[in-house]
Amino acid sequence: MSIDTYTETLKINKLIEKATSHFQLSSTQLYKKILKNHEGELTELGAINVKTGKYTGRSPKDKFIVTEPSYKDNINWGDINQPMDEETFLKLYNKVLDYLNQKEELYIFSGYAGSDKESRLKLKVINELAWHNLFARNMFIRPESIDEAQNIKPNFTIVSAPHFKANPKLDGTHSETFVIISFKHKVILIGGTEYAGEMKKGIFSVMNYLLPIQDIMSMHCSANVGEKGDVALFFGLSGTGKTTLSADPKRKLIGDDEHGWNKNGVFNIEGGCYAKAIHLSKQKEPQIYNAIKYGTILENTVTNDDGTVDFDDNTYTENTRAAYPIDYIENIVTPSKAAHPNTIIFLTADAFGVIPPISKLTKDQAMYHFLSGFTSKLAGTERGVTEPQPSFSTCFGAPFLPLSPTKYADLLGNLIDIHDVDVYLVNTGWTGGKYGVGRRISLHYTREMVDQAISGKLKNTKYIKDDTFGLNIPVQIDSVPTTILNPINAWNNKDNYKAQAYDLIQRFNNNFKKFGKEVEHIANKGAFNQ
């Protein structure tokens, strides 16, 4: 099959220039379309509540990268970065473009990924659904004017057709759903799923390719900055506390999920926040709760007849979400960038209940835990996950990393050295027993520990090296019970603790073998009990 970039561009332009295609609509204009099309409902808080159908999380098994000659040797192919040949992609791409051309209305957004203009990606988003376009408007960086938007020549285009269902036998997919990235054609093609998070994570995957090949670190983390300009990064997978812990009233938010780190410092890749909304309350998370207002999208929350939202109701999913512009948070940095980090926090939700609530890592331990990326898959963030499961996600973001893990590890290691960054491992998971026996570590105590780490109070405090993991645990932290600092003390049965801990250590060792001899020096110095 032959189709050139010129032909594709003509088809894209035809979609954009259709009389019924709506370009750069405001939030109010999109609200009107959403309500008219019955895509969502208005809540008492002013936010729009939508349902994403049967897919309430990402579909990682349906994600592909096109095997184009100029790029294929750079990609870390495997279960995460699944290959699709170019001919198969182009056939499906044209089917989707023809499908969208028949739609009565389309919604177009132009904007950016990357708040540092030196490391910015120009975007165009073509949506079948009005609420998806509002999502794009909320999550990506918005141009300051219509004129600016019209003059954006995109480096990448998202084509989103959630109601187009693929035929696996004909289209080369695994199911009706597909998320396909083509670096040659500069397209992210999405179909068969209404879960809007595929758009944001698709662009993140693209940035995780484009930035590191320029020796710019890309990171699955949140970031904030204190009054003195001290910057903290929070690494962790969905549900481990990145959004919650970085939304600190005492510090200004840089971003809640995706960042780059270049010669100028840290910058947000996005223009919005995508916060978990399950059990959200004004008391526990006031900044996030106050962002649930006009312009915000709520995904899969339950509303009562009077329009009130029941954030505790998980009828549709545990993975309820709120998508809002970053300026809905009161304490933010504008633009969303800051200096080089002083502190890095690795967040993990340990379902075994054996990792300390906080420990200070050496450089080698930091690299070991960055490559390991231990956490637990939390309910709802992926299809098929209904309770926490221990897992390893390289660099705390394996589903979004197209390149070899060592590329990201080398970049981070160099930056830690250059800028003398303190690194801590923080367990936001369980204590006193594994999941189902123990309890979740109190958010209040986690905040206290993190606050004192990023303020520098823990930099020179007294530490003990625990016998089980070889981690440096603070002897005392103000306002935190000493009984929880060393996890063995929180278990009633010490033998059970040791058995569970050694089981986890063995899992770490087995997982690290996949990296081979290339990182043997990190394992020798950074692994548990070294």
From Swiss-Prot:
Pathway listed: Carbohydrate biosynthesis; gluconeogenesis
Sequence positions that bind ATP: 201, 220, 236-244, 285, 321, 440-441, 446
Matching Gene3D superfamilies: 3.90.228.20, Phosphoenolpyruvate Carboxykinase, domain 1, Phosphoenolpyruvate Carboxykinase, domain 2
Binding-site residues, Mn(2+): K201, H220, D257
UniProt-annotated location(s): Cytoplasm
Assigned keywords, A-Z: ATP-binding, Cytoplasm, Decarboxylase, Gluconeogenesis, Lyase, Manganese, Metal-binding, Nucleotide-binding
UniProt GO BP: gluconeogenesis
Cofactor: Mn(2+)
Family from the record: Belongs to the phosphoenolpyruvate carboxykinase (ATP) family.
Protein name stated in the entry: Phosphoenolpyruvate carboxykinase (ATP)
Organism in which the protein naturally occurs: Staphylococcus epidermidis (strain ATCC 35984 / DSM 28319 / BCRC 17069 / CCUG 31568 / BM 3577 / RP62A)
